[in-house]
Structure formats: C-alpha cells, structure tokens
C-alpha cells in the first residue's frame, strides 16, 4: 500500500467519490437555476449511474491510502458499489413515487438523497475516527430531511422528530467512545489503535469502554436490540422510497465501517465484547421476529424483520475475520436486493397524496388479480427474506450458518434457525392476503398505474434474486476477488 498522500494513484482510486460529490453540486446548481422535477431526477439517476461505472475503473489503482482518513481497497469499492447501486434503485423509485405528487417542492429531495449517499459511500473506506464520524453524520443529517420529506403528511414529521432526537443521542455515544479511545492511545487511526491494543492497565479499560460506547451508537444505526425502538415508527412514517434507503443503504455503510474498525483495531479478540455482541444478536433475532408476528402494517412488519436480519448478520460479524467476511458480504448483497424489491413494490403501489402508503396487509388483498407481476415479485422477495430456495436469501443464510458453525457460534446459529422459522409465518400472511379476493372493487384498491420504469426496476431486482440464488458462483467470485484480495 502506498504512503498516505493524495497522489495521482490516490486521485484515480478516489474518483468515484469525487464524481459523486460533483454530481451533488451539479444537482444543487440545477435546482437553483430551474425547478424541474424530471430534469433533476434524470440528472440524479445519470450521475449515480456514472459513479457505478467509475467504480470498476478505479479498481486497478487500489489498494491505496488517500490521506490518513481513507483506504480505497477491494472491500471499500465493493461496499461502496452496493451503496451506489442501491441508491440508484431508490432514485428511480423516488422519481415514480414523487411524480404522483403533482406540483410542489420535490427537487430538494434528490439533493438530500445524494448527500446521504455520499456520506454512506465514504464510510466503507474510512480508517480514522474523523472520516467515520463525518460520513455517519452526513448520512444521518441527510436522512433526517428525507424522512420528514412528505408534504402534508403528519406521520413523516413525527417520524423525523423521533429520528432527530434518538440519532442525536446515538451520535453522543459515538463521540464519547471515540474520545475515550483517543484518551487511551492518543490516536484516532484504526490501525494505530490496533497496534497499541495489547497494552494492559487503564489504557485497555478506556479502550474497552470506548468500543462499547461506539457499538452502542452503531447499534442504533443498525436497529439492533435494545436500540431498535425508533425503527418501526420511522419506517412507517417515512415515504416508502426513503424507508428502502434507510433499510438498505445506511445499514450497508455502517456495517462495513464497523467491520473494518473491528478488524484493524483488533477488537475481535476481546471475549467480553464478543459475548455482548452475541447476546445482542440473539435478542435482535428473537425480538425482531416475535414482534413482527403482531403487525398488520407491512412497513412495520418489514421494520421488525430488518431488526432480525441485522441480528443474523452479526453471526457473520462474530465469525470474521476467519469465515464471516465473505458470508457478510453476500448476505448484505442478498438483503439489499430483497429489501429494495419489497419496499420498492410498496412505493409503486402507494399514492403520496393519500395520507399514507399502501402499507396495510389488507391493502394487498386481490393483488395477484390486479397486479400479477408485482404480486409474484413481492412473493419471491418475501420468500427470499424467509431464506427459501431458489433465492439469494437461501444461499445467504446457508453461508451464515456455515460460518457460525465453523467458529462454534452455536447459540447464535440456533437463534438464527428458530428466527427463520418464525419469520416464514408472518411473510406467508402477506402472501395469503395477496391471493385472497379483495372485498368490493378490486381495481379501486390498486388504482395507480405502474410506469415502465417501475416495472423495469422490479424486474431487474427479480432477475438478480433468482439467478444469483440458483447460481451464486459469479457473486461469490466477485466477493472473493475484491474483499478476499482487497
């Protein structure tokens, strides 16, 4: 790896992130010059597409340190790619969703989406507390605006307020944890902290306390028990495309940076931390699935489901770095495809001016008759979330179980298997509702015509879900090529 200076090689490796910043500035200028929803939406989608194309072009220049704050390597590019592709899908769904609003201020939404994506994209490359906190706060503050961005809907403003208060508390935990570690070692570099981690005495106590506080702040961002209370309310109140962004993009970014922090800081060796994380994983799996059983609101149900899925992901986190890195990467990819598809279908069936999204289970009655393609797609997405073959979700859970058993994580693996059985029941509730006849006029229950762009996005996600579920070798080869040798 080259020295931490901004050389030509570093500039080439950092180009996708620089391009994303330039696209953000361009969209801001477009909004200032001319308010045109179509133009701003197209510019956002085109800009994100260019950033996705730039990622493989930046790969030959990696691994390289970009100042002391970032390292662009295979892992950073892989997770940034997941973030950018997911943001591209959300931008396309947002165009369809906001196009139904009619007149009104819609353009700033895309600016917030881009700044949130920029914060999320730099997190996987962060190797310093300064870049870690900068990325997570850029993401969090932008999300605050996106959550409350719903015109006259009071539920969105309420969700935004809850997120503001609790996110501020989580940021305080993060900062205090970073301060304790800096007090112990006099450095904010992940690698430097790891090099000094063998020290015993007061410094080690500060380090453990600091890591525990950082994990508490991260647990809020990942919706892990007991820091999950905000999740169902925010998921329900936010516009459906924003819910998809929170469920996927923010989770990928935060999980990637904490995985890097633990690897470089040598925290995987601490038995007390591992025991605490295992307990959080088991509680998240069981609480998320059991609470989802009680829900009649689809977005709240998927919110509790996401809590359980992040608990599953902690099995790979605990198995890292021995077996869990590849399993975590594939699981995040599978989770991104399925969650984007599920929330995307909710967005396509929703009318923003109706006061709420199509988020009640009863709203989906008769969907197989009125919207057969969307109903079949949602059925496969839900089966993937349940871990059923031949979807990506099955392969992802299989690798989690293999990684967990291979590192003797028997209790978390048992909770994973039990949670998957419970989850199958509440996913089937939605499937049964879609197959039942709707009372009254079926067509009146799903009046929104789905534009070609919406069908194309869901179709692309569906192809990935089935093809990479039946034949996961290309995805696994990409993961091993980037993360395994990054």
Swiss-Prot record:
Catalytic activity entry: a quinone + NADH + 5 H(+)(in) = a quinol + NAD(+) + 4 H(+)(out)
Keyword Membrane set for record: yes
Any one Pfam family match given in the protein's UniProt record, by short name: Proton_antipo_M
Protein's cellular compartments: Cell inner membrane
GO terms, molecular function: NADH dehydrogenase (ubiquinone) activity; NADH:ubiquinone reductase (non-electrogenic) activity; quinone binding
Keyword Transmembrane helix: yes
GO cellular component: plasma membrane
GO aspect biological process, one term: ATP synthesis coupled electron transport
UniProt topology in membrane: Multi-pass membrane protein
Predominant cellular place of this UniProt entry's protein: membrane
Highest taxon of source: Bacteria
InterPro entries xref list: NADH-Q_OxRdtase_suN/2, ND/Mrp_TM
EC code(s) of this entry: 7.1.1.-
Residue ranges crossing the lipid bilayer per the database entry: 11-31, 39-59, 76-96, 108-128, 129-149, 165-185, 208-228, 239-259, 275-295, 307-327, 329-349, 375-395, 398-418, 419-439, 456-476
Role according to the record: NDH-1 shuttles electrons from NADH, via FMN and iron-sulfur (Fe-S) centers, to quinones in the respiratory chain. The immediate electron acceptor for the enzyme in this species is believed to be ubiquinone. Couples the redox reaction to proton translocation (for every two electrons transferred, four hydrogen ions are translocated across the cytoplasmic membrane), and thus conserves the redox energy in a proton gradient.
NCBIfam families (UniProt xref): NDH_I_N
Family from the record: Belongs to the complex I subunit 2 family.
Assembly: NDH-1 is composed of 14 different subunits. Subunits NuoA, H, J, K, L, M, N constitute the membrane sector of the complex.
Name this polypeptide is given: NADH-quinone oxidoreductase subunit N 2
Gene: nuoN2
């Amino acid at each position: 790896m080259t020295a931490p200076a901004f050389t030509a090689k570093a500039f080439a490796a950092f180009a996708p992130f620089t391009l994303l910043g330039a696209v953000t500035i361009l969209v801001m200028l477009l909004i200032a010059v001319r308010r045109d929803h179509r133009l701003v939406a197209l510019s956002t989608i085109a800009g994100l597409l260019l950033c996705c194309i730039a990622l493989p072009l930046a790969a030959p220049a990696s691994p390289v340190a970009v100042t002391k704050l970032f390292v662009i390597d295979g892992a950073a590019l892989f997770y940034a790619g997941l973030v950018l592709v997911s943001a591209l899908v959300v931008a396309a769904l947002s165009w369809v969703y906001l196009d139904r609003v009619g007149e009104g201020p819609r353009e700033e939404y895309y600016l917030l989406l881009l700044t949130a994506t920029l914060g999320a994209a730099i997190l996987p490359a962060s190797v310093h507390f300064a870049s870690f906190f900068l990325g997570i706060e850029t993401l969090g503050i932008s999300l605050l605006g996106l959550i409350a961005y719903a015109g006259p809907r009071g539920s969105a403003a309420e969700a935004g307020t809850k997120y503001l208060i609790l996110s501020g508390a989580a940021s305080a935990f993060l900062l205090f944890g970073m301060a304790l570690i800096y007090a112990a070692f006099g450095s904010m570099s992940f690698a430097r902290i790891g090099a000094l981690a063998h020290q015993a005495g007061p410094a080690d106590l500060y380090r453990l306390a600091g890591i525990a506080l950082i994990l508490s702040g991260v647990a809020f961002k990942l919706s892990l028990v007991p820091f999950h209370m905000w999740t169902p309310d925010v998921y329900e109140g936010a516009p459906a495309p924003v819910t998809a962004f929170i469920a996927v993009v923010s989770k990928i970014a935060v999980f990637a940076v904490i995985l890097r922090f633990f690897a470089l800081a040598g925290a995987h060796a601490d038995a007390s931390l591992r025991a605490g994380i295992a307990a959080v994983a088991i509680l998240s799996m069981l609480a998320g699935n059991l609470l989802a059983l009680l829900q009649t609101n689809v977005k709240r149900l998927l919110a509790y489901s996401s809590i359980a899925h992040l608990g599953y992901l902690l099995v790979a986190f605990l198995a890292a770095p021995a077996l869990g890195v590849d399993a975590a990467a594939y699981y995040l990819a599978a989770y991104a495809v399925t969650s984007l598809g599920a929330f995307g279908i909710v967005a396509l069936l929703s009318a923003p001016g109706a006061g709420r999204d199509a988020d009640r289970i009863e709203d989906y009655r008769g969907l197989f008759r009125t919207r057969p393609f969307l109903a079949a797609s949602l059925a496969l997405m839900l089966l993937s979330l349940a871990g059923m073959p031949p979807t990506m979700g099955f392969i992802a859970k299989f690798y989690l179980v293999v990684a967990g058993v291979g590192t003797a994580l028997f209790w978390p693996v048992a909770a994973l298997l039990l949670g998957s059985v419970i989850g199958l029941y509440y996913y089937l509730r939605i499937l049964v509702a879609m197959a039942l006849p709707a009372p009254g006029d079926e067509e009146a229950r799903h009046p929104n015509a789905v534009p070609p762009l919406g069908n194309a996005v869901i179709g692309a996600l569906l192809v990935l879900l089935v093809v990479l579920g039946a034949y996961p070798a290309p995805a696994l080869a990409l993961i091993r090529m980037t993360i395994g040798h990054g």
